């Protein structure tokens, strides 16, 4: 009995140790090529000299060694300062354990003391029948590296039996070189069996992809998402280097729980990825709750190959502990790779890591030799999850060899021959006495270069035209993947043949409808006018990238022939404009007004700063703010919105966007400054003045024939303490302070010069802060004419034109 117990305990201990322990490779070789003594690098790893048993017999004639002339920043002495340089084809032969191995080649393209300049070195590399590099130039590869570096490591995964034969072949009349060679064994079928679930999903087919044991790989990208660089010695036993994803444009918030324990399992043992990868993650939005952002990760690859995409996940946030709290879809190259990814459900619980494998072919459709592979993680909107977000811990991208055993990218158009081995006897001496031959050669070469340049320019123009033509179709394809698409007949059924009109605008009519599950929705049908496709794309693109308590939720769309419609949540209390109209004769609830103003500000702050791609609305007005049952405001109608990078301070518009009375002056005339997200700030200020009654007094003053510029009388009333035009006599002192704060914030928002206006994140701080912290801004003095606005403006709601024109000189600053 005791023996059985001891046996079971020993088995349990061995299994647990296998799960939690790092990998211990059977083969580890580190060769400092060209060096004469063994050395230790900065990380403590031992590099040895090349053994004569693994060198070709023609060592002296085929190669020589040299030392780099100088050591550039970031370049370690071992293994980069010494190199073996090859005059002719040269083969290393390594005895290895059967299986698959990591082969890492180290290059430092610089000048060497022997006179060799590695910048001008072109060569090919083969191993056991696989072509790893062809006509390879280390310097150009280093120059294009992300992040920038002065040295280079090329990593390959090679199937081996007992011997690894590594051959370097210089291009004709040139030299080849290498600084270091590393060989490390790996677990059996580590990259070919699939993810933690032993499945390798093919994103282009319903049939799973298969990788046999004879496949070679090149490691293209290995990223620690949300974390720092993980150096070789900190890996899980295979000496891989994990780069930070900071250089790849990711802006989602980082998850880093100090001291979190990662619970490795038999399906995901500790050697799959190191602790530092699973302990940090990046949320694809900027908040852990009620926010969503479609985040694209773009990773440069070589066209014409299949790729293995391995994604690592681990839920470490203490509040995410149950299945269903965070669910998202995975898209690779705009194709649905996995619809529902619930890390808690798939892995078995919190702090349990997992990894998924996908295969995708990247062709030449883009016209580029090195296109970008796109990866998107998209939260599912139609689930009752707590956190509308997506999470990612690590990414590995590996290229598979083609049918010819090739991993090298297509040859660049270089005036260098690669077809034979250099030999002095084969070099043709210059022809004396025949200068015309040189002239002919120069003419031919010049013509070829000119023709090639012309062809490249034409190809670029064609590709640009093709992209512009297909931009709308590609956007709609993406919408189909992310949202529910309705046919027009379904819209008629949902709206009961469009019988209940909620509102009308310049771009379409909004109807009330009911889905089959009983949910009430708003159906906005765009007018059948030429050019409305752009408005549709604008609105769906903008709304599909948002999920915030103060932004209207997009539920679906219709894109059928000339029919365009948007299906969104329905809000019972209608628009802010209707709310203001209903309460004109009543003393308003200041707390409600304040809550609405603050909610709108937060929604705009999210559009400007919470999305990976900034969204500028360009049509903020009461009609485009909807109120739910609790008077929570939601920004709606994104037909005029523009998406831009956050670093873009000035936007380019070919038309005037907005509604008279709310358009920022710089949108109408560039004499006021550049167009930016500050244009929304101006519209917000005008909207808040509407809410507190200031715009009503403008109309009264104008109708009485006064030419007073309304900020002037607001300043005067504030100085005299006269605010009865806003709040009446029944307001208490506390509400009086709130209203005054809203006025001051509005006055700052409607400054004529955009640079004088606060950004929306500052506006939120001002509204939430103390009245004592706010100062009265200087009086504005610049006006804009009614005629100028009417001539240049594209109204978002044509029915307001007449009303707004009456007060234009008073309301546009």
From Swiss-Prot:
The membrane topology term of the UniProt record is: Single-pass type I membrane protein
Q: Which residues lie on this side of the membrane: Cytoplasmic?
A: 459-813
Q: In what residue span(s) does the Protein kinase domain sit?
A: 496-771
Residues that bind ATP: 502-510, 524
Instruction: Report the locations given in the UniProt record.
Output: Membrane
Signal peptide annotation: 1-21
Active site positions, chain numbering: 619 (proton acceptor)
Task: List every stretch annotated Disordered.
Answer: 791-813
The record's annotation in SMART domains points to: S_TKc
Q: Which regions are flagged for Polar residues bias?
A: 804-813
Known InterPro entries for this protein? Answer: Kinase-like_dom_sf, LRK10/LRL21-25-like, Malectin-like_Carb-bd_dom, Prot_kinase_dom, Protein_kinase_ATP_BS, Ser/Thr_kinase_AS
So which residues have sugars stuck on them? 46, 61, 165, 202, 213, 263, 286, 293, 384, 401
Task: Offer one Pfam family short name for this entry.
Answer: Pkinase
Q: Write the Enzyme Commission number(s) for this entry.
A: 2.7.11.-
One of the GO BP terms on file: response to metal ion
Q: Name one GO molecular function term.
A: protein serine/threonine kinase activity
Per the UniProt record, which residue ranges are transmembrane?
438-458
Q: Which domain of life is it from?
A: Eukaryota
Q: Which UniProt keywords apply?
A: ATP-binding, Glycoprotein, Kinase, Membrane, Nucleotide-binding, Serine/threonine-protein kinase, Signal, Transferase, Transmembrane, Transmembrane helix
Q: Which GO terms describe its cellular component?
A: membrane
Extracellular topological domain residue ranges: 22-437
Q: What family name appears in the similarity comment?
A: Belongs to the protein kinase superfamily. Ser/Thr protein kinase family.
This protein is called Probable receptor-like protein kinase At5g39020
């Amino acid at each position: 009995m005791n023996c059985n117990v001891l046996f079971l305990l020993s088995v349990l201990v061995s299994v647990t140790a296998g799960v939690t322990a790092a990998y211990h490779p059977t083969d580890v070789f580190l060769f400092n090529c060209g060096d004469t003594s063994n050395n230790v690098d900065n990380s403590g790893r031992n590099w040895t000299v090349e053994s004569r048993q693994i060198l070709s017999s023609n060592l002296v004639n085929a190669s020589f060694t040299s030392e780099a002339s100088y050591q550039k920043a970031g370049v370690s002495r071992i293994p980069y300062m010494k190199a073996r340089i090859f005059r002719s084809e040269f083969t290393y032969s390594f005895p290895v354990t059967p299986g698959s191995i990591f082969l890492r080649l180290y290059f430092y393209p610089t000048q060497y003391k022997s006179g060799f300049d590695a910048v001008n070195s072109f060569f090919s590399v083969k191993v056991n029948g696989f072509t790893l590099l062809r006509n390879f130039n280390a310097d150009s590869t280093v120059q294009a590296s992300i992040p920038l570096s002065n040295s280079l490591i090329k990593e390959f995964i090679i199937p081996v039996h007992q011997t690894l034969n590594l051959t370097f072949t210089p291009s004709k009349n040139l030299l080849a070189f290498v600084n270091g060679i590393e060989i490390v064994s790996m677990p059996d079928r580590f990259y070919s069996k699939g993810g933690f679930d032993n499945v390798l999903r093919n994103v282009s087919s319903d049939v799973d992809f298969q990788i046999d044991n004879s496949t070679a790989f090149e490691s293209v990208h290995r990223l620690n998402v949300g974390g720092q660089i993980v150096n070789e010695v900190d890996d899980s036993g295979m000496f891989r280097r994990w780069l930070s994803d900071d250089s790849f444009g990711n802006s989602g918030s980082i998850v880093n729980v100090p001291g979190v324990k990662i619970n490795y399992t038999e399906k995901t043992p500790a050697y799959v990825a190191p602790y530092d990868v699973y302990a940090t993650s990046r949320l694809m939005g900027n908040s852990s709750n009620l926010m969503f952002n479609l985040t694209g990760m773009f990773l440069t690859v070589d066209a014409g190959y299949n790729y293995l995409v391995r994604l690592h996940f681990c839920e470490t946030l203490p509040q995410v502990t149950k299945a269903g709290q965070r669910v998202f879809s995975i898209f690779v190259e705009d194709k649905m790779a996995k619809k529902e990814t619930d890390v808690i459900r798939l892995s078995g619980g919190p702090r349990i890591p997992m990894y998924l494998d996908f295969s995708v072919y990247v062709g030449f459709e883009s016209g580029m030799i090195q296109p970008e592979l796109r990866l998107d993680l998209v939260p599912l909107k139609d689930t009752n999850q707590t956190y509308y977000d997506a999470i990612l811990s690590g990414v590995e991208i590996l290229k598979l060899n083609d049918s010819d055993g090739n991993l090298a990218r297509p040859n660049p158009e270089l005036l260098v021959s690669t077809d034979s081995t250099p030999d002095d006897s084969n070099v043709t001496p210059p022809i004396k006495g025949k200068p015309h031959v040189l002239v002919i050669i120069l003419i031919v070469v010049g013509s070829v270069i000119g023709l090639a340049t012309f062809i490249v320019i034409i190809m670029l123009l064609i590709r640009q035209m093709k992209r512009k033509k297909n931009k709308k179709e590609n956007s709609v394809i993406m919408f189909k993947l992310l949202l529910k698409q309705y046919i027009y007949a379904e819209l008629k059924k949902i709206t009961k043949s469009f019988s209940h009109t909620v509102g009308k605008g310049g771009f379409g009519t909004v109807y009330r409808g009911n889905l089959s599950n009983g949910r009430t929705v708003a159906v906005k049908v765009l007018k059948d006018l030429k050019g409305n496709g752009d408005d549709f794309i604008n609105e769906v693109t903008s709304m599909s990238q948002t999920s915030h308590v103060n932004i209207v939720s997009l539920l679906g769309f219709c894109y059928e022939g000339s029919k365009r419609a948007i299906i969104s949540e329905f809000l019972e209390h209608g628009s802010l404009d209707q709310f203001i109209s209903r309460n004109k004769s009543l003393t308003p609830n200041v707390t409600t007004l304040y809550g609405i103003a603050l909610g709108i500000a937060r929604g705009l702050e999210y559009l400007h700063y919470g999305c990976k791609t900034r969204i500028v609305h360009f049509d903020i007005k009461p009609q485009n703010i909807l109120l739910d049952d609790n008077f929570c405001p939601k920004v709606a109608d994104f037909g005029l919105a523009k998406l831009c990078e956050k670093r873009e301070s000035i936007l380019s518009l070919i038309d005037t966007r907005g509604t008279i009375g709310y358009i920022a002056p710089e949108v109408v005339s560039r004499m006021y400054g550049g167009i930016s997200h500050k244009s929304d700030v101006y519209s917000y200020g005008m909207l808040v003045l509407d809410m507190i009654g200031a715009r009503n007094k403008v109309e009264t003053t104008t109708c009485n024939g006064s030419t007073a510029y309304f900020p002037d009388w607001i300043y005067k009333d504030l100085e005299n303490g006269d605010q009865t035009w806003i709040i009446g006599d029944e307001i208490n002192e506390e509400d009086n302070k709130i209203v005054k704060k809203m006025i001051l914030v509005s006055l700052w928002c409607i400054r004529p010069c955009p640079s004088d206006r606060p950004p929306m994140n500052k506006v939120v701080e001002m509204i939430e802060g103390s009245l004592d912290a706010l100062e009265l801004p200087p009086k504005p003095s610049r006006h804009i004419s009614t005629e100028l606005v009417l001539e240049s403006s594209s109204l978002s709601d044509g029915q307001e034109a007449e009303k707004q024109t009456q007060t234009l000189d008073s309301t546009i600053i």
